[in-house]
């Protein structure tokens, strides 16, 4: 099962130069709690944006068309969505999708759960989530994040679950 996780500002911004354009420890903690010891898929630009931080305690799948792309020990490279879907059929674990926007969009039909952090602020950046069709999803959970000295932006966490098809 694919689970997508992203944070976005008021305008749907999700990134700047491969990184998050804001500092929000609550969201980073939320992401870490959900993805620790899990399989994480991301695009090359997202992976490169992390630099050597390559998220320890996770197995990372990097999607790229570059045939000779090098990754850290806890990562592997796949070259297409079709290759990823074939890979996913052979494993029982959930796969967490962490960006970028084209990968979120491409995997939306296969996504069963979306965890979205909405940040009530506007930032500068270069990557937007784009239009996400939530009509086949249901908002099943939502809670406000704590605003304090470390977490200066109002934010809320949402869990969207794909609705079962009615026959």
Curated annotation (Swiss-Prot):
List of residues binding substrate: 27, 58, 117
InterPro entries per the UniProt record, alphabetical: DHFR, DHFR-like_dom_sf, DHFR_CS, DHFR_dom
EC code: 1.5.1.3
SUPFAM superfamilies membership: Dihydrofolate reductase-like
EC top class named in words: oxidoreductase
Gene Ontology molecular-function annotations: dihydrofolate reductase activity; NADP binding
Residues binding NADP(+), per UniProt: 7, 13-19, 45-46, 64-65, 99-106
Protein name: Dihydrofolate reductase
Organism: Enterococcus faecium
């Amino acid at each position: 099962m694919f689970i997508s996780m992203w944070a976005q500002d008021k305008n749907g911004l999700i990134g700047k130069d491969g990184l998050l354009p804001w500092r929000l420890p609550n969201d980073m903690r939320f992401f870490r709690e959900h993805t620790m010891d899990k399989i994480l898929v991301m695009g090359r630009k997202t992976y490169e944006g992390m630099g050597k931080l390559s998220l320890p305690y996770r197995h990372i799948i990097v999607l790229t068309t570059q045939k000779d792309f090098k990754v850290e020990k806890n990562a592997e490279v796949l070259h297409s969505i079709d290759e990823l879907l074939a890979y996913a059929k052979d494993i029982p674990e959930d796969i967490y999708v962490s960006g970028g926007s084209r990968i979120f969009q491409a995997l939306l039909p296969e996504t069963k759960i979306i965890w979205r952090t909405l940040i009530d602020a506007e930032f500068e950046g270069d990557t937007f989530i784009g239009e996400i069709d939530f009509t086949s999803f249901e908002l099943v959970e939502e809670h406000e994040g704590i605003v304090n000295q470390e977490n200066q932006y109002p934010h809320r966490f949402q869990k969207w679950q794909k609705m079962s098809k009615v026959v």
